[in-house]
Amino acid sequence: MGGRHRVTAFSLLTLVLLLWLVSGRSCGQPLRKCAGNKPCQSPRPPVVLVPGDLGNQLEAKLDKPSVVHYICYKKTDTFFTLWLNLEQLVPVAIDCWMDNIRLIYNRTTHTTSSPPGVNITVPGFGQTYSLEYLDPSKRSVGMYFFNIAQALVDWGYTRGDDVRGAPYDWRKAPNENKDYFLALQQMIEEMATNAGRPVVLIAHSMGNMYMLYFLNQQPQAWKDKYIKAFIALGAPWAGVAKTLRVITSGDNNGIPVIRPLKIRSQQRTAVSTSWLLPYSHTWPKDKVLIQTPTTNYTVMDYQRLYSDLDFKDGWLMRQDTESLLFDLTPPGVAVHCLYGSGIPTSEAFQYTSKFPDVDPTVVMGDGDGTVNLLSATQCKRWVRRQKQSVTLQELPGNEHVNMLLNVSTVAYIKKVLF
């Protein structure tokens, strides 16, 4: 009996060692070494998924000196989901949520911070779960990058290995997320080294602005070595008109239980909102974007608009961020620019004498329901400004978020990868 057990134990140990050698793994990462101790080339390029505004989970831990309502938690022992948590987006509870997720702008440092006693983190950097589903319960209403991530898995990719997510604090603009870009650079270099080939970036919405900023900071030699292509989905290259409504009278994003004016104060604190106002390098300087009985506002009138809204912090935020991508410098990598069209999209807002504390009449134009067509197609200006290819692909009838679920989008991504 004892001998048999020793033989069995030895056999199991041998099997484990063989499996370890065959798998070629060390510290959880594939070695993929070939002749000459050089990395083998993977049959497919690694992929980094980058979400847009509101496009990944946020978590919070509380130890607050006070609360806005007696039902609000003042202290928590662990981190909990702050976004997306549908249970917090209902009357009364939303007051707690707004007070936790808001930012406080410092006019001296020109930076923002969470309220006292609120610690907000971005979970799952390097993983895909926090952007596949915005709601950890995986309700369909919170489905975001799941279809694309699952398609990649079906093609042979592995979550957390050669397909990874790069979530970030989307309340802020790139100038306040320097640690994020350092972590992103290191992750891209690691993935490219492991695979023996450069990475493909797939970004959505505001995530494309983040990636353009990131690429503009990198030397061309770095981009040549580590980036194969940049797939931009629904990019607001020149800003979006919708953000004007957000800062003026609030926007409930179609959630009927939330009053736009109720959520306006919180939405204004997000620096990324002011960053994404329409830009004068693209929008006609004489086009009226906001109309009231006494005043018309164009892209040249933001200072006056913020003043009339009594929102000085907003004007400072815009000044802090407007130059980050104002020139729309080419990314210096192959770009595939996919954009939706044919969906009524907000392009101007008409207010009554109750401005700004009233819902506007919305003037519609072309786009994907969120990003105006004028903005989404600005990648065309790079066609003759960089040697790398720039491809534009219109997706008629594709809505801004639903484009991530569309078979045409998935098929296009596969064509780029393989």
Which residues does each predicted region cover?
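Glycine-rich, aromatic-lined ligand/substrate-binding cores of catalytic
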Residues: 271-354
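N-terminal non-catalytic accessory region
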Residues: 2-202, 206-267, 277, 284-286, ...
